[in-house]
Amino acid sequence: MNYHQYYPVDIVNGPGTRCTLFVSGCVHECPGCYNKSTWRLNSGMPFTAEMEDRIVNDLNDSRIKRQGISLSGGDPLHPQNVPEILKLVKRIRRECAGKDIWVWTGYKLDELNAQQREVVDLINVLVDGK
């Protein structure tokens, strides 16, 4: 999985102060999309174990209390992104007690496959559709 941008402190993409990750890869081509640069799967930077560690550390940093994380893009539920997103979400659930997880996707809930639904079962809010 690649990502375009990571904001360790964000007050725009969801409630409260939070972390936000914009991943690469989207097939929806929504009219008016403000993140067209994230559509190509191979754009951006590789999502590494170090980046995953950074996100978990930022979520647990007591100096800046964060309500949770927003996962956007691109599309976090693009089939090629789901394995890494699922791994990240599971780790946040294990290691970041009380943090909420919001996911934005161009898919509608009834279009999701089993692996995408596994992600949805672990998050707090899904903003779905085009």
Enumerate the predicted regions with their spans:
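Conserved Radical SAM active-site core
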Residues: 1-3, 17, 35-103, 109-116
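N-terminal pre-triad scaffold of radical SAM enzymes
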Residues: 2-29
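Short, flexible active-site-adjacent loop segments at beta-strand->alpha-helix junctions, enriched
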Residues: 27, 107, 129
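Residues embedded in well-ordered beta-strands within globular domains across many folds
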Residues: 70, 124-127
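A generic structural signal for alpha->beta connector loops
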Residues: 98, 122-123
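Classical nucleotidyltransferase
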Residues: 113, 127-130
